[in-house]
Amino acid sequence: MATLFIADLHLSLHEPAITAGFLRFLRHDAIHADALYILGDLFDAWIGDDDPQPLHATIAAELYVLHQRGIPCYFVHGNRDFLIGKRFAKQSGMTLLPTETVLDLYGQKILILHGDTLCTDDHHYQQFRRRVHNPFIQRLFLLLPLSSRVKIAAKMRATSQQENQKKSQQIMDVNHDAVLERLRHYQVKTMIHGHTHRPAIHQVDLGESYGRRAVLGAWHEEGSMIKVTPQNIELISFPF
């Protein structure tokens, strides 16, 4: 009895080893889980459900196998793939979740989210996030020809990489007060997120008690998952 969480795979045609590792994970690990939660940035970029990349169809087909086996798969949007929509969700058998969701797993309440909204010290990114999550702007972008969307996404990615090189590691990490605020808002003691690529399980001082903040690692040289059972929350890394 276990529920699995992953994030920040950044799947792309340029990283076939990561794709192969993810497919093995689905076939050998996720297939035995009670449920799979993907907490954003499954793909390195997403410019619309109408993008005909073969990789998207491959991943959708493999995820749909879980659906056919009766294993639910849930998805929280990341900062790279926030445009994944109902069409791809239906193709893959995934259920799209809100930015923040509280789960009741084995008798414990857990807040899950991608994690970028916790990085409140990065003011420039938060302003950018508000713009690109505007439904009107998203609709306009998705009305553009696919070729135009490809160019815009590439330019935005290049700009983001340049800006991140100038930022301190502290700015790009979560803000402690933001973490406390979300835990208290939802009245939970456990949070699971990705985004920062800094895998760890942190103890959080809530004043009257202690909580946990479990952070998923990115899939670069190895895979990363969090396994929640009735007895434990475990951060696990594994080779592709």
From Swiss-Prot:
**Catalytic EC class:** hydrolase
User: What Gene Ontology biological process does one annotation of this record name?
Assistant: lipid A biosynthetic process
Name the residues that bind substrate.
Answer: 79-80, 122, 160, 164, 167, 195
Q: Where is the signal peptide?
A: none
UniProt-listed Enzyme Commission number(s): 3.6.1.54
Cite the cofactor comment.
Answer: Binds 2 Mn(2+) ions per subunit in a binuclear metal center.
Record protein name field: UDP-2,3-diacylglucosamine hydrolase
Job of this protein: Hydrolyzes the pyrophosphate bond of UDP-2,3-diacylglucosamine to yield 2,3-diacylglucosamine 1-phosphate (lipid X) and UMP by catalyzing the attack of water at the alpha-P atom. Involved in the biosynthesis of lipid A, a phosphorylated glycolipid that anchors the lipopolysaccharide to the outer membrane of the cell.
- Keywords tagged on the record: Cell inner membrane, Cell membrane, Hydrolase, Lipid A biosynthesis, Lipid biosynthesis, Lipid metabolism, Manganese, Membrane, Metal-binding
Q: Which residues bind Mn(2+) 2?
A: 41, 79, 114, 195
Name the protein family.
Belongs to the LpxH family.
Domain of life of the native organism: Bacteria
Q: Where is it found, in Gene Ontology cellular component terms? A: cytoplasm; extrinsic component of plasma membrane
